Each structure stands twice: as structure tokens, then as C-alpha cells.
């Protein structure tokens, strides 16, 4: 039986989102959530969770290239804890190193500079985070 997973690419201004299935190991970008200093519209997040009913939620963990934590790492952990606390969802953290760089590269290849919109980058980053989790997680 497959697992439905929802992924978030946490950011202080925008939070990317993607939905995916473990059977295919693929993800599809959803519209990004606007955030103010890392605080999302929690009603919009709740609506998304109710609509998609994920078995698990994945939050990208921003780490430095050497694996050490950075300022945004703590904020992403806090976001993950709030998701779990507010909505009772099963949350996992996934290393997201280089996902934004890879997302920009993929979007640029498809549509050039005009395609490089922040919300689109965040959504593709969330897809990459989720697909990485499908590949490496033991569920």
C-alpha cells in the first residue's frame, strides 16, 4: 500500500509545497504559501492538509554543505514541530542541501530566465525534498 506524503520547503517569505505518492516515488508541486518572517497562514496550511490527507509530512531541513546547522535550520525545525503540534500529523525532516540550486537549474532548462519565479522554485524544491525522502526513507 502506498503512502501519500506532503512536503514543505520552509522559507521566511515563501514556503514551497508538494504532494506525492510512495508507489511512484514522484511528487507534484502545489502553490507555495506566503509567509511573513517564517510565519505562514496556518488556516491555508490546515486547508491543504485536510484536502490532501497525507499519511506523512516532510519538512526540508536546511543545512550547510558540511552538514552543520544554520540559522534557518532551527526555524525549519520549529515549523515542523508546530505542524505536528497543531495538526497532529506525522512529521519527518529531510536534508534539503542543494534542492534550491537544483530546482533553479531544472526550471531554467525548461523556460529560461522568465520561468525563474520564486513560488515555482519553492514548489520544485519541495518536490525534490519529497522525492529524496521517498528514495532514502524506510517507511
Curated annotation (Swiss-Prot):
Q: Which CDD domains match?
A: YqgF
Question: Transmembrane stretches, by residue range?
Answer: none
User: What subcellular locations does the record give?
Assistant: Cytoplasm
EC number(s) per UniProt? 3.1.-.-
Q: Name one GO molecular function term.
A: nuclease activity
The main place the protein resides is cytoplasm
What is seen without this gene?
Controversial; it has been found to be non-essential. Has also been found to be essential.
UniProt keyword annotations, A-Z: Cytoplasm, Hydrolase, Nuclease, Ribosome biogenesis
The yes or no answer to whether the keyword Nuclease is present is yes
Classification via InterPro entries:
RNaseH-like_sf, YqgF, YqgF/RNaseH-like_dom, YqgF/RNaseH-like_dom_sf
Question: What's the superkingdom here?
Answer: Bacteria
Q: Which GO terms describe its biological process?
A: rRNA 5'-end processing
> Cross-referenced SUPFAM superfamilies, in alphabetical order?
Ribonuclease H-like
This molecule's function is given as:
Could be a nuclease involved in processing of the 5'-end of pre-16S rRNA.
The text of the family note is: Belongs to the YqgF nuclease family.
Name of this chain's protein: Putative pre-16S rRNA nuclease
Natural source organism: Haemophilus influenzae (strain ATCC 51907 / DSM 11121 / KW20 / Rd)
